[in-house]
């Protein structure tokens, strides 16, 4: 952990949120951004940034991270200054490595914003089949017709 801030009042809290919301937007003006919202043990929260910096240096990608100290949530942002199209070689250097690294530390590949369309295939790296089935059951209770974010929440049923 390099630095941290605890808001002392409502105004400071709002200021912190403005900065937080502006980071990814600002990075997007510099180049393509690869965003990951992950949860890892607090002791290794920033280690992932350091590991990814070393891994992506040859690709000219830069890495920044910020998050929630209390719950181990890291917003990992990787960007390619001056290159606005996502590069398959950069993506291949990130995935599945980033998910494997997180799984080895018993973290979660999706901390707070859901799986989207890109992560369901990787969910089994950080969640057991029984946990995924429990998640599927809860989703079924809350959305019995499957109309909320269809195909973006859970991976297909395993046939193993």
Task: State each model region's role.
Residues 71-75, 83-86, 116-119, 155-160:
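Flexible loop/turn segments at secondary-structure boundaries
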Residues 96-98, 138:
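Alpha-helix-loop-beta-strand connector modules within alpha/beta enzyme cores
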Residues 120-160:
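Activity-critical C-terminal alpha-helical subdomain
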Residues 5-19, 110-125, 154-158:
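Short proline/glycine- and acidic-rich turn/helix-capping motifs at secondary-structure junctions
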Residues 103-115, 144-148:
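Alpha-helix capping/hinge segments and adjacent helical runs
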Residues 1-94, 101, 105:
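C-terminal substrate-recognition/cap domain of FAD-linked oxidoreductases
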Residues 36, 76-78, 113, 119, ...:
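A structural signal for short, well-ordered beta-strand segments
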